[in-house]
Curated annotation (Swiss-Prot):
Protein name per UniProt: Homocysteine-responsive endoplasmic reticulum-resident ubiquitin-like domain member 2 protein
Cellular component terms (Gene Ontology): membrane
GN (gene name): herpud2
Ranges of Polar residues composition bias in the record: 95-106, 211-221
Keyword Transmembrane assigned: yes
Role according to the record: Could be involved in the unfolded protein response (UPR) pathway.
Membrane topology (UniProt): Single-pass membrane protein
Membrane spanning stretches: 299-319
Lineage: Eukaryota, Metazoa, Chordata, Craniata, Vertebrata
Low complexity composition-biased segments: 107-124
Keywords of this entry: Membrane, Transmembrane, Transmembrane helix, Unfolded protein response
Length: 399
């Protein structure tokens, strides 16, 4: 029963993992061993692999040499797929590799001939390359031509292109001048654009730093140097006298509105009943404290002092304000004596006459000035003392 089964052939489909060869169909018998199958493959397989370099894999298992095919193959399958893996020590040379070697040899021969001639140009090299490697499609030739033009523009516009030109024209001493400079650089067009942007940015930063370092020195040098005064024989003519400032003095404490006029104190005009109640309550508390914790005479004195302070703040005593403005004008005249020095001789004589008259009047009015100074000092002391007793409200916000 087993002998007919052993004699019937089975079909094996040999598959190569690298897909270099097509699937090979081989007929064999079940009583063959794996070693005998390998020896048969070394004769009929296209690559003629050696038996010791073959590895057979069936259903994910490596087949050993001593196994029989009847013990390994499944009987219900009509075709048995076997994978052949060869560890070839001398792989066969493919026709594509030989073609590429020939083309590389042709390109190297053309390049060496151009170097020996010394008159080859990048255009001729590109023509040789294009003739060696023909374009499969016309669209690729147009794209290649556009890429080469863009590359040439980038090479010539690169900031370091002048270095290559200078090196080609004037080589360093001790070195022979090269016949031709390399037509192609190691950088791609995108890298060349990136280098160009980086160079422009570094140059811009350097120019800004240089300008910032030179600006203070230029400012210092621009300061005028005082020239020595040269005594001339004829004195310069007198400059025209400036007209006297006849403009009336303005109140320095006036508040200006944002629209261009004096600020109207709206708090005094539009004060509601709550503000008046708050003011009256503060005054009543102060007066009650003085009335209950002191005598009647002190209460009257405090009332009178408060009334005087209120009248002074309301502007009922303009004499003291006029004296303060007069002192301010006198101080301004002392600070600016240049106006007096620039006057004419006639005006100087007029001022001297006025000074003599003032000396005569000073003797008569000395007592009045002294008495007025004592009264002003006493008044300022009293007002300062009593105003310090009255608490001040919060500062008003500026309009």
């Amino acid at each position: 029963m087993d002998q007919p089964v052993m004699d019937c052939p089975v079909t094996l489909v040999i598959k190569a993992p690298n897909q270099k060869y097509d699937d090979q169909t081989i007929n064999c018998f079940l009583d063959w061993t794996v070693e005998k199958l390998k020896s048969h493959l070394s004769k009929v397989y296209p690559s003629k692999p050696l038996a010791k370099d073959q590895r057979l894999v069936y259903s994910g298992k490596l087949l050993l040499d001593h196994l029989l095919l009847k013990d390994v193959l499944r009987k219900q399958d009509e075709y048995h797929m076997v994978h052949l893996v060869c560890a070839s020590r001398t792989p066969p040379s493919s026709p594509k590799a030989s073609t590429s070697n020939k083309s590389m040899g042709t390109a190297s021969i053309s390049r060496s001939s151009s170097e020996h001639s010394g008159s080859a140009s990048p255009a001729s090299i590109r023509q040789d390359t294009s003739s060696t490697y023909p374009d499969p499609r016309p669209g690729d030739s147009i794209r290649h031509r556009h890429t080469s033009l863009m590359y040439n523009n980038l090479v010539h516009s690169h900031p370091f292109s002048y270095l290559r030109q200078e090196y080609a024209l004037n080589p360093p001493p001790g070195q022979a001048s090269p016949s031709t400079f390399p037509a192609y650089s190691a950088f791609t067009p995108l890298q060349m654009m990136w280098w160009q942007q980086l160079y422009a940015r570094q140059y811009y930063i350097y120019s800004q730093a240089t300008a910032s370092n030179q600006s203070p020195s230029n400012g210092e040098n621009a300061q005028p140097v005082p020239r020595p005064v040269i005594n001339s024989e004829s004195p310069p003519p007198n400059p025209p006298r400036a007209p006297p400032n006849v403009a009336p003095e303005m109140n320095p404490n006036i508040q200006m509105n944002a629209q261009g006029g004096p600020v109207m104190n709206e708090e005094d005009i539009n004060r509601d009943w709550l503000d008046w109640m708050y003011t009256v309550s503060r005054a009543a508390i102060l007066l009650s404290i003085v009335y209950f914790y002191s005598s009647f005479s002190r209460f009257v004195m405090v009332m009178g002092a408060m009334i005087l302070v209120y009248m002074h703040q309301a502007g009922w005593f303009p004499l003291l304000q006029d004296e303060g403005q007069q002192h301010a004008r006198d101080n301004a005249a002392e600070v600016n004596p240049d106006h007096v020095n620039n006057n004419d001789p006639q005006e100087l004589e007029h001022r001297m006459d006025e000074g003599l008259q003032e000396e005569h009047n000073n003797n008569a009015g000395g007592n009045v000035v002294a008495r007025r100074g004592v009264l002003a000092s006493a008044w300022s002391f009293i007002t300062t003392f009593f105003t310090s007793l009255i608490p001040e409200g919060p500062p008003q916000g500026a309009n």
